[in-house]
Amino acid sequence: AVRSGARQVSLPRHHYGDYPHAARLWQLPVVPRSPHVGGPGLHWACAPSSPLGLDEDVWPLWASPAPAGAWRVLDCAYAPLQLEPAAVRPNLDHVWQMWTPNKALGMTGVRAAYAIAPVQATPQELAALRDLAPSWVVGAHGVAMLQAWTTPQVQAWLQASLVQLRAWKAQQVQL
């Protein structure tokens, strides 16, 4: 994003400490988040939001492609664990998606992820992302987790886990 002209970062109200830390490293100011922030910069959202699990407030703005110089990134770390469908479904064609299955697999110490580019990503943006890839060190354990994530057995296990999590949630609600 910085290489493409980003000059600021907007974050969800509740966000991971990694986000503002990375912004400081790149000397980008963190600006107050509003559903209307959308100009040049790096704009983060989470689906579902963390830690509340609610829908983000940016989906109306993010329904259309990002304007020039704006990078929209959706952190999908908790999406596989979402127990109910989102009230508002974001149009994922217009955002960079970051997925890490570590939380869904109960492997929070394993740091490995993958990105899905927006439909309108340019060949130059994709090449720039690939050029950065060597700086993202992923150990053999992370590679194994990402490879396992796509298997039918792991996806079946996840679906069975969601059934159990929904049952536990229903029990807690009744308390």
PLM region descriptions:
Residues 97-173:
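PLP-dependent aminotransferase class I/II
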Residues 31-82:
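Active-site phosphate-binding strand-loop segment of PLP-dependent enzymes
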Residues 1-8, 21-26:
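Phosphate-binding glycine-rich loop
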Residues 8-10, 40:
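Conserved beta-strand elements of the Class I
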Residues 9, 72, 95-97:
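Hydrophobic/aromatic residues located in beta-strands of well-ordered beta-sheets
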Residues 19, 23-25, 43, 77, ...:
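Generic structural signal for conserved hydrophobic packing positions in ordered secondary structure
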Residues 14-25, 55-58, 62-64:
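Class I S-adenosyl-L-methionine-dependent methyltransferase catalytic core
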